[in-house]
Amino acid sequence: MHPLGPDGKVPRDGGARCNYTDEFTPGPAALINGAPRLLFLPVSGPAGMGETVRSMQIAYAARRRWPDAKPHFALSREAPLAADFPFDCTLLPASPTFHSAEVSQLIASLQPDVVIFDNSGRTRQLRAARAAGARIVYISSRPRQRRKAFRWRWRRMIDEHWIAYPRFLAGSLSWLERFKLRLQPQSTVRYLDVILPAPTPQAEARAAQRLGVATTPFALFVAGGVTNHPHAIDAVRIFVAAAKRCAAMGHRTVLIGTGEQAAAADAQLITLPRLPADELIALLRRAQVVVTNGGATLLQAMASGAACIAVPIAGDQPERIRRCVRAGVALAAPLAESAMAAQAAELLGSAAQRAALVESCQRLKLADGLAIAVQGLECLLRERGDS
């Protein structure tokens, strides 16, 4: 058993496995090779797609690290991305959490090296992964799922627990969580901070040119994957109306992923379909102001150097946004057309306020969550290869 230090970390000693880290340390290039089989089980359904997109980006990062990797997903057939999914996929009537028999059968059939549960999972499913000899990653982005991951029964099965948000949003480990890690040092906790696919400068410039935002400063409105979210049925409509109002004030405005088409009268409005992650990041890097919900896009915008206005559209987002405001890294606006447009216009007109927000974001030193995830997978695959 490794004692915890005063900062809640387990010291790295004697080659022992560290069970608390949010720092990325590159491993040897040849740490593990071959074609790892990775099974992703993100919570999915007709409303929202944050977990699916996060798991997709981790799968892409794994493919870059291991070109012959074999990612496989199980998704609800109602998920917004299910119809045109870029990886091998098993479609289920609802989220994988509700289909333990099918998920257990899939695990037994695929014999994955690692199973990644993203905000999903049942005890039966974790046991099936263990029975197949797989290593288990559990990603939590909400307090309830984090508590589940720290239950004694699950702690014995989970090899890596990845907390999807940075510490200033998700909170540091509690004394009880540190105590449980001390008793079970074989399990690792990592903060992913921000999932940020990084286009090259050349790719960013090409994307900006293609999308028509290469030169003119603009405000970017990104509603996110909230089309049918039960907590914000009208969110997309309100984002569209707010973007149009901002454009009508004379500000160059870009609206992404709502299906809306700009009318001829909307001279200052550019409407774009849902974009690949690297093109979205290219726009976030170039936008003066980003208006988005309190999910993953907010963190991506902050890490990209944009001044952000956060709008809550789901039940877990108001507290997250309050923490961002307290940290001085974002402004908050209600889900209301006039307030969103007015705040965007005000921030566009204040270079000093934008600079203060960006400077506060830079002080956070948000880590690259994809690099951290790949490091975790390398660790698990090395252990599996040695077992």
Where are these regions (language model features)?
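A nucleotide-sugar donor-handling region in carbohydrate enzymes
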Residues: 157-225, 258
